[in-house]
């Protein structure tokens, strides 16, 4: 990189490219004359589509290949959906900035035959498609009469599977649908009382080399402080629980006056156990808030739930 150039690593999926091109355009507007290039590539999570995400492994499924490009100086930044970025990054890399969050809610997308129904009124045995253990566990807890099936592929592929009749509905991130111009497919936004969203959902995280002052100066225009505070608390919560992106851990954050309020949840995969609580703290104590809520849930049994999940997921020797 020179002071007048910036190389961006991105996944090559349609949604990833939309997000990366938005970052490129915002940086180009902020820095006239900056030469920006995008290197798109497939990650492990993109390549393995016939296995549930949780069975592949967890650390960096959608990020490792992008990070490798930065570590060998073939890219200067990587653009991630923040929910896919592990809380512990490889040595030499850092989370440079977090963009303003879109709606972090989970969204219900219905098959046309169910257009007059809601998630709450779907009949027994209706087939719900989701690749997220977090969504699966929470929905099993609230709607044990429904049937859940794994669905993989990019957003367009998943919608095609829904429309072909393989599912009665899908649960997807509202932000991703919106960024793809598919907001009209959202049948309802799932209330946080039913489904807490993933850590970082709806925000983009821009990763860079640790201490790269020139790059940090270039990307700081995209930093959104309120989103950063919320996500700092969420990521601390996840890190302290020693959870990853593919475990049933959910969060919700909101501001009330000068305080940040964090709600957190851990559930068993069968949906029979769900531990949920909430804490608040001054905004400048966001990370400590996440740590404290994680310890509170641990004291209520969350550690045992997660230990069982990790033990069952561990491959046989």
Curated annotation (Swiss-Prot):
Keywords: Chlorophyll biosynthesis, Porphyrin biosynthesis, Transferase. The keyword Iron does not apply. InterPro entries: HemC, Porphobilin_deaminase_cofac_BS, Porphobilin_deaminase_N, Porphobilinogen_deaminase_C, Porphobilinogen_deaminase_C_sf. Binds 1 dipyrromethane group covalently. It catalyses: 4 porphobilinogen + H2O = hydroxymethylbilane + 4 NH4(+). One of its GO terms (cellular component) is cytoplasm. Its cofactor is dipyrromethane. The modification S-(dipyrrolylmethanemethyl)cysteine is found at residue 245. The porphobilinogen subunits are added to the dipyrromethane group. This is Porphobilinogen deaminase. Its EC number is 2.5.1.61. It comes from the Bacteria. HAMAP family: Porphobil_deam (MF_00260). Belongs to the HMBS family. GO terms for biological process: chlorophyll biosynthetic process; protoporphyrinogen IX biosynthetic process. One of its GO terms (molecular function) is hydroxymethylbilane synthase activity. Pathway: Porphyrin-containing compound metabolism; protoporphyrin-IX biosynthesis; coproporphyrinogen-III from 5-aminolevulinate: step 2/4; Porphyrin-containing compound metabolism; chlorophyll biosynthesis. Tetrapolymerization of the monopyrrole PBG into the hydroxymethylbilane pre-uroporphyrinogen in several discrete steps. Signal peptide: none annotated. Monomer.
